[in-house]
C-alpha cells in the first residue's frame, strides 16, 4: 500500500497527535484544558504518553478562561475542543486572549477529511456541507491557522502555529481531523527544538532608534517610566527592571501592567490611570517632560475612561513591532533589543525622587470605628496580608479597580481582564493559574470575584476540586452587578441576582471534607482570618464570603462607570 511505502521512508515515524503534543510539552505545556467530544477523543489518548495532564473542564468557555489563566503563569497553554459546538463555545475566551495578548494553542477535533470533502450531513454542522465556516470564525481572533488536512504539511503547520503563538503572544488555531490523528509523519524533526527566539532588529536601524531615545532622555528634566500589559506579554520584564534599576527613574504601572515591576523598589510610584490615579501619582506623571511608555494599551478601563493627560510630544512608546518617539514612528523594531541597548548606553539621567506608597489605610479610615468592610479599607489591608510570589486574580468590576490601591510584595503576579472585560472570566482563570502555580512549587493563588460574576462560571470550582487545587477564593457579596449599577439602572432588576449559599457550594461539587468555607461580615472577622496560620497555609480550597455594602465601590470604578455611561448615552 502507498501508505506503507510512505511510512517506510520515514526515519522516525510518529503519529500526528503525538508530534503535536510532544511539541507542546517542549515549549512548557504540562496540562491541557478542554472538554472531550467525539472528534477529539482519539487525540486525547496520546496525552499521557506525551507527559501531559488532562484537566477536564465543565464547559468550553470555562476551559478557555482556564487556558488563559494557565498561559499567564506558564507562558503558553493548550485548549482542546470539538468541531462546531465545542469550538464556538470557547470563542469568547479565545477572543479575550487575543485582545489581551495571551498565547493559547486551540486544537479543534474535526470530522474525517473524507467526510469534509464529500460535504456529508454530519452532527455538529450547519447541515449545508460547509466544514470551513467555524474555522473562519476563529480566523479573526487567531494569529495563525493550521488546518491539518494534508499529511505532508502537518509538521510544518504545527511548528509554525506554536512558534507564532509564542512570538506574537496570541491564540492560534489547529484543526485536527479524526483520520489525521493517527497518520505517520517524520518524527526526526522533534530532535530539533523549535526556534522561539525573536528575529533580531536591523542593527543600524536599532542603533539609530536607541540614539534618538537617549537624546531625549538625557535632555529631560523629570522623565518617568510607565509600564503596561504588553511589557508582560512580550516578555521584556527583565529589560524593564534593568531600566528601572539603572536609571532610578520614577516608575509607574497602568492597571493592566499591575504586577509587572517589583513594587517594593524605592522608585516604584504606583498605578497611573488618569483621573483614577492617586493625586500624587497623577501629578508626577502628568507633569513629566518625558514618559518612557512600555507596552501601552490605552483602553477605556485602563485609563479611567480615556482620562490620560499626557501628550505624545512628551512620550516615547515602546512596542513589540515598533517604537514611536514623540510623533516619529519607527516600524519593524522590537522593543526588547532597543530597551537592552538603552540600558547599556544610558549614562546619567535626571531621576527625581518618588513619593513612596504603602498599604497604610487612608486618613478617613484610620480612626474609624465602623465594622463595615468598605473598598477604601479592604484593599490596603489585602496588601498587608499578601505574600511574596502570590498570584492575585481580580474579576471585572469592583475588584479590578480596587486592586489599584494595593501595593504588592515582591514577585506577585496580577491577573485581570481589563480590556476584554468578560464577567466570570476570573473563576476559570483562577483554575488555570492555580494549576500552573502547582507546577511551580505551589505558589499561593488568590481570587477576588463578585457574587454576580461567580454565577456565570461557578462550575470551575468543581474542576479545582477535581485537580486538587487549593486557591483562596474571596467572593465579594454585594447583591449583584455593582459596576453595571454605576453605569445604568441602579435599582433595576436586571442588575440583581439570586442570592446563593456560596460557602456551601463546594459540597455540591463533591468536595466533602476537601475545602473550608467562611462567611465574613466585619472588619474584625477579616482581620482575624488574615492572621490565621492554617488559613494562610492554604491546606485546601478555601471559599470566603466577603459581605460588603451594595452601594460601595472604589473611586476609580465610579469615575470609569460615569465615563462609560456618558459614551453610551
Swiss-Prot record:
One Pfam family named in its UniProt record: TPP_enzyme_M
Gene Ontology cellular component annotations, sorted alphabetically: cytosol; nucleus
Gene3D superfamilies membership: 3.40.50.970, TPP-binding domain
A GO BP entry: aromatic amino acid family catabolic process to alcohol via Ehrlich pathway
Assigned EC number: 4.1.1.1
Stored InterPro entries: DHS-like_NAD/FAD-binding_dom (IPR029035), PDC/IPDC-like (IPR012110), THDP-binding (IPR029061), Thiamin_PyroP_enz_cen_dom (IPR012000), Thiamin_PyroP_enz_TPP-bd_dom (IPR012001), TPP_enzyme_TPP-bd (IPR011766), TPP_PDC_IPDC (IPR047214), TPP_PYR_PDC_IPDC-like (IPR047213)
The protein's name in its UniProt record: Pyruvate decarboxylase
Organism: Aspergillus terreus (strain NIH 2624 / FGSC A1156)
CDD domains: TPP_PDC_IPDC, TPP_PYR_PDC_IPDC_like
Quaternary structure note: Homotetramer.
Cofactor: how bound: Binds 1 Mg(2+) per subunit.
Family: Belongs to the TPP enzyme family.
Binding-site list for Mg(2+): 451, 478, 480
PANTHER family: PYRUVATE DECARBOXYLASE, PYRUVATE DECARBOXYLASE ISOZYME 1-RELATED
Chain residues that bind thiamine diphosphate: 398, 421-423, 452-453, 478-483
GO MF terms, alphabetically ordered: magnesium ion binding; pyruvate decarboxylase activity; thiamine pyrophosphate binding
Amino acid at each position: 500500500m502507498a501508505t506503507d511505502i510512505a511510512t517506510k521512508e520515514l526515519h522516525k515515524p510518529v503519529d500526528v497527535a503525538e508530534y503535536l503534543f510532544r511539541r507542546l510539552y517542549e515549549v512548557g505545556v504540562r496540562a491541557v484544558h478542554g472538554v472531550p467530544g467525539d472528534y477529539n477523543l482519539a487525540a486525547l489518548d496520546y496525552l499521557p504518553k506525551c507527559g501531559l495532564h488532562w484537566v477536564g473542564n465543565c464547559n468550553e468557555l470555562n476551559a478557555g478562561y482556564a487556558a488563559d489563566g494557565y498561559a499567564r503563569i506558564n507562558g503558553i497553554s493548550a485548549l482542546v475542543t470539538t468541531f462546531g459546538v465545542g469550538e464556538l463555545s470557547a470563542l469568547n475566551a479565545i477572543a479575550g486572549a487575543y485582545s489581551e495578548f495571551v498565547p493559547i494553542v486551540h486544537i479543534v477535533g474535526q470530522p474525517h477529511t473524507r467526510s469534509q470533502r464529500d460535504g456529508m450531513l454530519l452532527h455538529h454542522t450547519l447541515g449545508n456541507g460547509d466544514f470551513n465556516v467555524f474555522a473562519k470564525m476563529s480566523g479573526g481572533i487567531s494569529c495563525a491557522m493550521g488546518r491539518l488536512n494534508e499529511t505532508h504539511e502537518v509538521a510544518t503547520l504545527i511548528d509554525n502555529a506554536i512558534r507564532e503563538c509564542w512570538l506574537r503572544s496570541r491564540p492560534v488555531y489547529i484543526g485536527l481531523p479524526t483520520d489525521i490523528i493517527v497518520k505517520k509523519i517524520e518524527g526526526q524533526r522533534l530532535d530539533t527544538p523549535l526556534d522561539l527566539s525573536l528575529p533580531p532588529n536591523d542593527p543600524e536601524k536599532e542603533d539609530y532608534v536607541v540614539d534618538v531615545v537617549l537624546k531625549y532622555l538625557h535632555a529631560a528634566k523629570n522623565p518617568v517610566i510607565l509600564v503596561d500589559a504588553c511589557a508582560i506579554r512580550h516578555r521584556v520584564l527583565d529589560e524593564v527592571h534593568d531600566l528601572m534599576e539603572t536609571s532610578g527613574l520614577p516608575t509607574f504601572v497602568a492597571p493592566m501592567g499591575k504586577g509587572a515591576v517589583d513594587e517594593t523598589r524605592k522608585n516604584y510610584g504606583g498605578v497611573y490611570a488618569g483621573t483614577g490615579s492617586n493625586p500624587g501619582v497623577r501629578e508626577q506623571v502628568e507633569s513629566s517632560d518625558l514618559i518612557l511608555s512600555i507596552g501601552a494599551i490605552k483602553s477605556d478601563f485602563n485609563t479611567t475612561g480615556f482620562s490620560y493627560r499626557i501628550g505624545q510630544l512628551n512620550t516615547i512608546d515602546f512596542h513589540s513591532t515598533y517604537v514611536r518617539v514623540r510623533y516619529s514612528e519607527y516600524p519593524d523594531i522590537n522593543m526588547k533589543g532597543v530597551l537592552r541597548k538603552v540600558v547599556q548606553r544610558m549614562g546619567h539621567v535626571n531621576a527625581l525622587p518618588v513619593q513612596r506608597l504603602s498599604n497604610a489605610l487612608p486618613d478617613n479610615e484610620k480612626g474609624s470605628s465602623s465594622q463595615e468592610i468598605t473598598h477604601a479599607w479592604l484593599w490596603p489591608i489585602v496588601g498587608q496580608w499578601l505574600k511574596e510570589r502570590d498570584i492575585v486574580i481580580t474579576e471585572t468590576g469592583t475588584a479590578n479597580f480596587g486592586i489599584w490601591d494595593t501595593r504588592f510584595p515582591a514577585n506577585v503576579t496580577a491577573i485581570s481582564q481589563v480590556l476584554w472585560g468578560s464577567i466570570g472570566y476570573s473563576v476559570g482563570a483562577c483554575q488555570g493559574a492555580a494549576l500552573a502555580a502547582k507546577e511551580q512549587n505551589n505558589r499561593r493563588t488568590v481570587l477576588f470575584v463578585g457574587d454576580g460574576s461567580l454565577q456565570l462560571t461557578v462550575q470551575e470550582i468543581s474542576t479545582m476540586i477535581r485537580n486538587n487545587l487549593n486557591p483562596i477564593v474571596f467572593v465579594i457579596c454585594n447583591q449583584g452587578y455593582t459596576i453595571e449599577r454605576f453605569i445604568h439602572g441602579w435599582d433595576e432588576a436586571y442588575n440583581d441576582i439570586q442570592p446563593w449559599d456560596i460557602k456551601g457550594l463546594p459540597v455540591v461539587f463533591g468536595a466533602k471534607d476537601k475545602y473550608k468555607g467562611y462567611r465574613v461580615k466585619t472588619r474584625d472577622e477579616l482581620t482575624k482570618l488574615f492572621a490565621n496560620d492554617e488559613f494562610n497555609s492554604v491546606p485546601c480550597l478555601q471559599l470566603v464570603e466577603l459581605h460588603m455594602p451594595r452601594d460601595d465601590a472604589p473611586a476609580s470604578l465610579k469615575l470609569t462607570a460615569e465615563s462609560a455611561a456618558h459614551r453610551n448615552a
